[in-house]
């Protein structure tokens, strides 16, 4: 069996990405922050990555993306993880030291789920959103925060995905990303997803060079809103393979979009939301390019 030059290049890139994920798995990383300094030329911009979910391995996805953006695109990247009491990474932990890094950040990439951060930590996210900083939200960040009734008097209770107050209905997910938790679309961990570019959006800057997007994560329901600029549609497949047949019972559903949210005093912040982003998803070159 012969392997083409293009095939070797693709294999090499895949091995490098797998290595990056392994190096920064929860067993090895033990303290916040992990910092990747910008390669040359530097853009002079800083991105903060906030990782803490307990199912899709945000603690693997975000360091890999941060390193790519630093080495190949010239961004200074700071990755913050949920930590346990010993200072070691704990998937889904509601303890993320170092969030003060958001004070001078030019962008925030968030991948969290059901967090109830201490007031002194959540304040930094609140401050960032008040100044309408750009946000990229992945997968479970639509339900990234969850506060129980014991914390109803917490100043940041409104960020909970179940918040029903008229001042911030739907919490962080709805108010910032445009979508709160709705539910799975198909059988998660049994059906993978093909992501197709909407033809009319093929020239959008975010979609430059994006093709053949397949992700392992199962579909999420999306209730499209008028203020979404929808870029892609997700088609659930019958198998976990890229060539799996379409699930004919599941029409395509919006999967990536842009929008604006309102910070303090009505200032608008830019948002990109993806309903995917599991660590297996970024093994696909098309999805990595999309993010």
Report each predicted region and the residues it spans:
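Bacterial N-terminal signal peptides that target proteins for export
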Residues: 1-17
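Catalytic beta-strand/loop cores that center a nucleophilic Ser/Cys/Thr
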Residues: 33-35, 70, 75-76, 90-93, ...
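Helical hinge/lid and interdomain linker segments adjacent to catalytic or ligand-binding clefts
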Residues: 32-39, 46-145
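Bacterial N-terminal signal peptides
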Residues: 14-27
């Amino acid at each position: 069996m012969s392997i083409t030059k293009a095939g070797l290049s693709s294999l090499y890139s895949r091995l490098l990405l797998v290595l990056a994920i392994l190096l920064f798995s929860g067993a090895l990383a033990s303290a916040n922050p992990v910092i990747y300094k910008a390669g040359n030329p530097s853009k002079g911009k800083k991105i903060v990555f906030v990782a803490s979910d307990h199912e899709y391995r945000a603690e693997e996805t975000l360091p890999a993306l941060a390193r790519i953006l630093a080495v190949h695109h010239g961004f200074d990247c700071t990755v913050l993880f949920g930590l346990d009491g010993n200072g070691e990474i704990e998937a889904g932990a509601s303890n993320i030291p170092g969030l003060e890094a958001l004070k001078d950040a030019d962008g925030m990439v968030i991948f969290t789920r059901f967090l109830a951060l201490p007031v002194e930590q959540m304040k930094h996210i609140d401050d960032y959103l008040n100044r309408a900083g750009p946000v990229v939200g992945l997968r479970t960040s639509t339900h990234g925060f969850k506060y129980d009734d014991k914390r109803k008097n917490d100043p940041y209770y409104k960020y909970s995905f179940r918040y029903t107050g008229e001042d911030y209905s739907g919490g962080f997910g709805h108010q910032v990303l445009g979508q709160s938790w709705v539910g799975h679309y198909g059988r998660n961990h049994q059906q993978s997803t093909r992501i197709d570019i909407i033809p009319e959006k093929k020239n959008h800057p975010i979609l430059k060079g994006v093709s053949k997007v397949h992700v392992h994560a199962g579909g999420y329901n999306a209730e499209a809103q008028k203020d979404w600029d929808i870029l892609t549609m997700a088609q659930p497949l019958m198998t976990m393979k890229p060539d799996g047949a379409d699930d004919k019972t599941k029409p395509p559903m919006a999967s990536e979009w842009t929008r604006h949210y309102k910070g303090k005093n009505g200032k608008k912040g830019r948002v990109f939301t993806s309903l995917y982003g599991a660590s297996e998803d970024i093994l696909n070159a098309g999805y990595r390019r999309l993010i």
